[in-house]
């Protein structure tokens, strides 16, 4: 019985460190990395904006962001993921805009804040150039 107890403790001691940190959120990426990601997301697409939401680094925590942003009247909820795609690696929220509607940066800022995150920038592409606007 004593040997069995030692074996169980040894197995527990070896397996426990493997699970530590497995549910860690993604670390903050640099603005340069985020700009490249935004350019890839928005390239060749119209009616789409991206928002940098500081702290948005866990996919399950971001569910509230999708719920809050998709409730905005200019979001095309007929698109996949209710028109709101979450990228926790780059801390980006991509929003599909309904045809004929315009984006309201103040409404996006409030929706993301209400979900518990800090919106920093809104990105669009105009004439193949990335345009960044502060929404803090």
Language model region names:
Residues 8-19:
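Bacterial N-terminal signal peptides
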Residues 56-67:
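Conserved redox-active cysteine motifs that mediate thiol-disulfide chemistry
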Residues 129-136:
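Short, low-order "capping/linker" segments at domain edges
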